[in-house]
Amino acid sequence: MLNNFLNLELLNISLSYPFLFLITTAIVLLLCSGFWKFHRSFYIGISSLSLIVSAFLILNNANAQGLEAKAFLATLNNDIVSFYASLVILCFSFLYLLMQKEENQGEFYALFLFMIASLLLMVSSSNLALIFIGLESSSLALYTLIAMRGSDNAISSAIKYFSVAAVGAGFFVMAVAFIYLKTGTLDLSANLALKNEFQKDPMLLGAGVMIFVLCAIKLSLAPFHFWLKDVYYAAHTNLVAFISVVPKVAMLVVVIRLFDFLNNTGFEYIIIVLAIFSMLIGAFAALSQNNIKKMFAYSSVVHSSLVLVACIPLLKEQNFDGILLAIFGYWTLFAFAN
């Protein structure tokens, strides 16, 4: 194992260049803001350029190694799911920066790049430990961004979001412990070979349900959506548009990998009930709102439920490529509409 880890060819470090470059740029911006004062156009320009370079590195990796490459002992993947999700994340992050016309603090842009790098790490891995690291790193940055911009209630809404997500993170960690206890691995793709054992083991099925609790919180599915209305109302409008798309695309990748793991276990019945319940709650709650941002919050609940319904066939191994095309196609159109 140690020899494999020291083998640079097996490590395939180039797959990590896109998010390592963003992290390096974020550190540079953080240092610049600490010693000099620049206009926001400088921070926006550097941040936008770093996103473009990161997208180029992803395309270059896909061209040079294909969409089956792995890195760091197969903990990082360059599959079609991570490839498309990474480009969507970078594209709409770039559009968000173009809308940025008020923020002059370099710390804001450094945190933003840290968050995007963490999201890229999350979508590029099927290893539960790396997924959790990417998820929590991006979430901590997002909580801070929400608190930095918006109304007087932005800090309290960020704390509420943090509190709800912390509960979900606890479920996630407990589920990871159960999965490792039963399988001896943290790799969701490796666990696909254990489907027969998984179908008979209530501990592993329960672990899958606990992981999905965190996914439901991040996707703002009812009844885990209580944080969303306050965040949408208090956060800056541009940031609301960003929150409604980019973090959810990253979490959608985790759901896709999780559903592969939960294949043919009967888990789809739980998802169907949750999706229908979430649609109804979001639709009826939106009708009673007198604030447009709060109405959009419940609209986001409904959209997440629709995407969740599209993911259900993944639990039955039916036309995987067609399902992914429909899911990402819908979410991309929704993002442009936003």
Regions found by a protein language model. Name each.
Residues M1-N338:
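Alpha-helical transmembrane segments of multi-pass membrane proteins predominantly involved
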